[in-house]
Amino acid sequence: MASEKQKQHAQPGKEHVMESSPQFSSSDYQPSNKLRGKVALITGGDSGIGRAVGYCFASEGATVAFTYVKGQEEKDAQETLQMLKEVKTSDSKEPIAIPTDLGFDENCKRVVDEVVNAFGRIDVLINNAAEQYESSTIEEIDEPRLERVFRTNIFSYFFLTRHALKHMKEGSSIINTTSVNAYKGNASLLDYTATKGAIVAFTRGLALQLAEKGIRVNGVAPGPIWTPLIPASFNEEKIKNFGSEVPMKRAGQPIEVAPSYVFLACNHCSSYFTGQVLHPNGGAVVNA
């Protein structure tokens, strides 16, 4: 599936330069207005899983706003924005793309304010942005890197959720992207895996807090999914063999994960789901 030419040398990775492009859409996906009239904010929505979620949400009638890394993902963001405009339904509003660094509270507040100024509210919040760096020992993880990973991967979830909740009503949904690594561990992604475990706990605790308000909180824990984060994180050998260790013997595609988010965002489909995590992971068995 991948070759040595795939290797990228900077986070968070760029989709438009990938030799084997991730699949964010499919002719087999048949929308049915599951999210008609909803306003969705997707972090890290310019590529990978976030782009596929945006595609499905827009196809299902949602108005979509997404964030991307300021100054690093402009081309991916513009391609995603154009795609969303093409697949959106006639009764949804024009999508918007917001460049930012989500690791800081003031930036997260600005993102929420921009979405609310444009669309009046937030019905679905997708906390999805992440970064990861490979290391062989804990000694390699210095304080600046540890803080950077935690700021992006879990601090931003707290920041965005806190600000977004002011504009979310009963029936709204929060969906957090965790990882199969939160359940099985990963020796070479120690700091990343720790944040993903924190996201599971955050999801379950927040679900308990918000149940009385009628706001559901769930998560998705993808397995090995082919996104720009992979060639930006691993060495050539791991890129080449990525996904081969799961029972299905291949990496998943973003479009194979995105319907899980549609399911959790749709009240008709998942009104009795909160505090739960879905596991699209190619057959890896985890203790949920």
From Swiss-Prot:
UniProt name for this protein: NADPH-dependent aldehyde reductase 1, chloroplastic
UniProt source species: Arabidopsis thaliana
Cysteine pairings via disulfide bonds: none
Lineage per the UniProt record: Eukaryota, Viridiplantae, Streptophyta, Embryophyta, Tracheophyta
Highest taxon above the source species: Eukaryota
Function: Aldehyde reductase that catalyzes the reduction of the aldehyde carbonyl groups on saturated and alpha,beta-unsaturated aldehydes with more than 5 carbons. No activity on alpha,beta-unsaturated ketones. Can use propionaldehyde, butyraldehyde, methylglyoxal, (e)-2-pentenal, (E)-2-hexenal, (Z)-3-hexenal and (E)-2-nonenal as substrates, but not propenal (acrolein), crotonaldehyde, 2-butanone, 3-buten-2-one or 1-penten-3-one. May act as a short alcohol-polyol-sugar dehydrogenase possibly related to carbohydrate metabolism and the acquisition of desiccation tolerance.
Region feature Disordered, mapped onto this chain: 1-32
Sites where the protein binds substrate: S179
Annotated family: Belongs to the short-chain dehydrogenases/reductases (SDR) family.
Record: active site: Y192 (proton acceptor)
PROSITE patterns on file: ADH_SHORT (PS00061)
